[in-house]
């Protein structure tokens, strides 16, 4: 199951302001705390953070909300985070802070046929493996190796890197994209 957390709603409830700008570190920390509480109270395995009602996302809030939420990894247990409703300028802010922390997240663009996009620090092999999974939905390491003409160890390392960053789900052998719909 997927839990959708509307960041715009959290912002309005947290700062009691009509503005749709997510700026300042204290505001970002307050929003992150609300997200963490919502995730902790949910039985869902995937949280979709919906930024569609946010107009401005500055670097400090991208760091506080997204990077620090991902750094909180062990406390998330088996839960995953996916971003949605981002505009290009917001993608850039999040990409910058995640790359700095060597973190990554999957983002779902809007549109009729959205394909997930990786934001942050991911190796070239990881990006190629993610693109392969986007086309097929699921794969064994041996299938990825055959599909990309890679040695088995290279395919396994790329998929394990994606799983480590919680960008894909694995049952031990098969890797798949996170459910977001």
Language-model-derived ranges and their functions:
Residues 1-24:
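Domain-start "cap" segments at the beginnings of catalytic or binding domains
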Residues 19-46, 51-103:
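Amphipathic alpha-helical interaction surfaces in cytosolic regulatory modules
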Residues 40-41, 133-137:
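Short helix-capping/hinge SLiMs at alpha-helix to coil transitions
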Residues 48, 135-148:
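Short acidic, hydrophobic short linear motifs in intrinsically disordered regions
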Residues 100-132, 157:
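Short alpha-helical segments that sit at the start of domains
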Residues 123, 170-181:
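Short, cationic-aromatic polyanion-contact patches
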Residues 149-164:
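Short amphipathic alpha-helical interaction segments
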């Amino acid at each position: 199951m997927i839990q959708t957390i509307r960041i715009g709603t959290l912002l309005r409830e947290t700062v009691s302001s009509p503005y749709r700008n997510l700026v300042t570190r204290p505001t970002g920390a307050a929003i992150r705390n609300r997200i963490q509480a919502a995730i902790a109270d949910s039985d869902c395995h995937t949280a979709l953070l919906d930024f569609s009602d946010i107009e401005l996302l500055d670097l400090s809030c991208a760091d506080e909300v997204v990077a620090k939420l991902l750094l909180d990894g062990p406390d998330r247990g088996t839960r995953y985070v996916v971003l949605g409703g981002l505009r290009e300028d917001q993608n850039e802010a999040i990409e910058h802070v995640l790359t700095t922390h060597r973190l990554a997240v999957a983002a779902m663009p809007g549109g009729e046929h959205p394909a997930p996009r990786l934001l942050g620090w991911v190796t070239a092999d990881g990006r190629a493996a993610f693109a392969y999974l986007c086309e097929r939905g699921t794969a064994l390491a041996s299938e990825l190796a055959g599909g990309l003409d890679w040695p088995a160890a290279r395919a396994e390392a790329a998929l394990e890197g994606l799983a480590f960053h919680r960008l894909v789900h694995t049952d031990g052998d098969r890797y798949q994209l996170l459910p977001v719909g």
